[in-house]
Amino acid sequence: MFGSLDISTSALVAQRIRMDTIAGNIANAQATRREDGQPGPFKRRIAIFETGDGQGRAGVHVSRIMEDPSVGQRVYQPEHPHAIQSGPYAGYVEYPNVDEATEMVNAILASRAYEANITAKDATKSMIAAT
């Protein structure tokens, strides 16, 4: 029975990390500089799940958070302070590869998965209490 609680708990932690990642993507959807201030747009991040915990226990965990390699949108805005200064894309601003609608859908899915795991955990606790 307690293994079931561990599985639900691991899923809750994984979904919380996924939600944090999605929130960061939404917050940086218009960021035209990287975190370190270097040129280039923010890159969307994705939480990668794996089963188990590497120690033989069941459940799920976030194995890593990777950057989405896809290219964001370039918008012609020569007056923008972060516009590309020279070359074929002079005057263009590179925006992140974050689609806010997709991120909102992912946030809803993560929220529903979190709720489902709370329900499973509560059901397990009820079964433990009944025995």
Regions found by a protein language model. Give the residues of each.
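Amphipathic alpha-helical polymerization modules
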Residues: 1-131
